[in-house]
Amino acid sequence: MSRVPTPPPPGEMTSGPVAESWCYTQVKVVKFSYMWTINNFSFCREEMGEVVRSSTFSSGPNDKMKWCLRVNPKGLDDESKDYLSLYLLLVSCPKSEVRAKFKFSLLNAKREETKAMESQRAYRFVQGKDWGFKKFIRRDFLLDEANGLLPDDKLTLFCEVSVVQDSVNISGQSNTNMLKVPECQLSDDLGNLWEGSRFTDCSLFVGGQEFKAHKSILAARSPVFNAMFEHKMEESKKNRVDISDVEPDVFREMMVFIYTGKAPNLEKMADNLLAAADKYALERLKVLCEEALCNSLSVENVADVLILADLHSAEQLKAQAIDFINRCSVLRQLGCKDGKNWNSNHAADIMETAGWKAMIQSHPHLVAEAFRALASAQCTPFGLPRKRLKQS
């Protein structure tokens, strides 16, 4: 009787490439176990290489494949004379060969499995062939009563065998009406809505330029816009918002982020975009700007970045800027030469920049913060990557 092909499980058809035909190969594995107790173990033959064998066993009464366990109480050879050796032996088999994996363990006084060892692959057995472990367990550890492995002088071995049987191929054709769910295009669709200025209901005027937008989207994305339109403010009544402190190109980039969650030109305007993100409470955009500024910190700009971070409560960026200054200062004190990322002269260079000198006059509290942090800093290894900023 021929096997009727069955389709792949539904869970495997929901994603990825789709083929017109398919095949499943099922490798059949028969698993069974065997327990062997050796009474009066201490009276077993004490000569190296001598063998004690179990009775034969199989997976069931109708299985003609017979196995047994083989123990060398005092090891198999000189290399293993201080160990107990344990092997699985194929006694008889109707096939020319068979592949099997196995696992051995001991049962302690509480009948718990312990000292387990298992094969890392399926070994090839032929009749009369054995596989196992020459150094299964040290004899001194086994004979130590404190370890509880020989209660009443009984050694109990537990063996689990997994025998590879035949392989079965199941093949068939895919249904022609199989559904493929398209990828989500929400970001692209909203981006097209913004770019096309379709169905807009408000206008935003920035630097003499008009940007048409959708109040519902602005309100959903920005708590500041939400407050404008929710309460009966002038902007809500006239559907007009005048913005005077953001440059048009920066505002456009912010709007692209509001609609799509992306800011393709962020690297070019991270400082101004951070200010806009802070003003309109766009937390994720703000942290993305912080990350970009952290990655571009230098001797020339660190003071300006520190002022910017303080002005807009960008705490992660502020901490990274102070850390940059302090690393340079500590390296200079330690007399370090040029390293992979740091130069001992950077600290002096920072203090010579126009940004640092301006900060002393306009933001002296930031200078004080930097030196307080330096005073409490621990001397840890330098040159490590900065921590990635947490994004909201």
From Swiss-Prot:
Any single GO BP term: proteasome-mediated ubiquitin-dependent protein catabolic process
Subunit-level organization: Homodimer. Heterodimer with SPOP. Component of cullin-RING-based BCR (BTB-CUL3-RBX1) E3 ubiquitin-protein ligase complexes containing homodimeric SPOPL or the heterodimer formed by SPOP and SPOPL.
Name of the protein: Speckle-type POZ protein-like B
Lineage, uppermost ranks: Eukaryota, Metazoa, Chordata, Craniata, Vertebrata
Location within or outside the cell: Nucleus
GO cellular component terms, semicolon-separated: Cul3-RING ubiquitin ligase complex; cytoplasm; nucleus
PROSITE patterns: BTB, MATH
Gene: spoplb
Residue ranges of every copy of the MATH domain listed in the record: 31-161
Family, as annotated: Belongs to the Tdpoz family.
Span of domain BTB: 200-267
Keyword Manganese: no
